[in-house]
Every structure is written in C-alpha cells, then in structure tokens.
Regions:
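Loop-to-helix transition at the N-terminal end of transmembrane alpha-helices
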Residues: 30, 53-54
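Condensing-enzyme catalytic core mediating Claisen C-C bond formation in acyl metabolism
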Residues: 1-27
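Generic secondary-structure signature for well-ordered alpha-helical cores
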Residues: 12-15, 39-44, 74-78
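Short glycine- and Lys/Arg-enriched binding-loop motifs that mark or flank ligand-binding interfaces
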Residues: 11, 16, 52, 58-61, ...
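Short acidic capping loops at alpha-helix termini that bridge into adjacent secondary structure
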Residues: 46-52, 81-83
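Short, well-ordered amphipathic alpha-helical segments that serve as non-catalytic structural scaffolds
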Residues: 27-43, 68-72, 97
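Conserved catalytic cysteine-centered active-site region
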Residues: 57-98
Length: 98
C-alpha cells in the first residue's frame, strides 16, 4: 500500500445502558452497520476496495470479543484479506479514529 486514504467516518447511535433500546443489539452488529454506512457514504468505494478498517470502541470486551473491528468488518462484507484494528481510547475512541 502506497497511500492511506480515509474515505468516510460514521458514529453509531447512543443509548442508555444497560436497559436502553439498543441493549439487545450485539456490539459487533452495531459496528457493522456503521461500517456499511461509511462505505455507502463513499461514492465508488465497495467493500472489496477496503484494505484496512480502524474502529474506535470504548469497551472492546464482552460478547463481541477483544477485536470488535475485525468481527464487525467481516459482518459488514469487508473481505477476509483486509486488516482491522480496534482503537480503545475510552470515551474518545471515535475521535481518535478520525
């Protein structure tokens, strides 16, 4: 890879924990929705074009496992050959990925 290009950034919805309306959604499923939307906002970019996914996640443990970026990217249709990394900066994780 010669050039790194950020094509899009999306934030997931925010809800009340642990009993809010989003509490029934798995974190990796929610993140995959954000990845699909990021791709939808980038004209001409398909999942096959993605070489790397960088995903901010404040609490990357629990049922989604410790590499939520990898699981979410696969669930979003990004090829298995693409890399993915989870950035944990707690409350500022999403900002660190921008």
């Amino acid at each position: 890879m010669k050039d790194a290009v950020i094509v899009s950034a999306v934030r997931t919805a925010v809800g009340k924990a642990p009993k809010g309306t989003l509490s029934i959604m798995r974190p990796d499923d929610m993140a995959s929705v954000a990845i699909r939307e990021a791709l939808a906002r980038a004209p001409g970019v398909s999942p096959a074009d993605v070489d790397d996914v960088i995903l901010g996640c404040a609490m990357p443990e629990g049922e989604q496992g410790l590499n939520v970026a990898r699981i979410a990217s696969l669930r979003a249709g990004v090829p298995i050959e693409a890399s993915a990394v989870t950035v944990n900066r707690f409350c500022s994780s999403a900002l660190a990925c921008r």
